[in-house]
Amino acid sequence: MATIADPRDIILAPVISEKSYSLIEDNVYTFIVHPDSNKTQIKIAIEQIFSVKVSSVNTANRQGKRKRTRTGFGQRKSTKRAIVTLAPGSKPIDLFGAPA
């Protein structure tokens, strides 16, 4: 397990998609996270950055797609995503001006 000191090094960016935007109503948020981070580190980082109580964390490793270029093939970067569920009664996270 790699030790990462700053919580902002663990949480890299929110995922902006239709699916993640619709899950906000259920207090479920999706983030792109550091590939070496684990669920406990993600939970602690979310609680420190946004001052909320996290109920559960699910993670998914997404393989980068293979893409064709003029000279052959390249590959997009692989990412790790964290689907974070907030505890009931926790205040919502205002990521992109979503309705609460």
From Swiss-Prot:
SUPFAM superfamilies: Ribosomal proteins S24e, L23 and L15e (SSF54189). The keyword rRNA-binding applies. GO terms for cellular component: ribonucleoprotein complex; ribosome. It comes from the Bacteria. GO terms for biological process: translation. Keywords: Ribonucleoprotein, Ribosomal protein, RNA-binding, rRNA-binding. PROSITE patterns: RIBOSOMAL_L23. GO terms for molecular function: rRNA binding; structural constituent of ribosome. Belongs to the universal ribosomal protein uL23 family. HAMAP family: Ribosomal_uL23_B. One of the early assembly proteins it binds 23S rRNA. One of the proteins that surrounds the polypeptide exit tunnel on the outside of the ribosome. Forms the main docking site for trigger factor binding to the ribosome. Part of the 50S ribosomal subunit. Contacts protein L29, and trigger factor when it is bound to the ribosome. This is Large ribosomal subunit protein uL23. The lineage of its organism: Bacteria, Bacillati, Actinomycetota, Actinomycetes, Mycobacteriales.
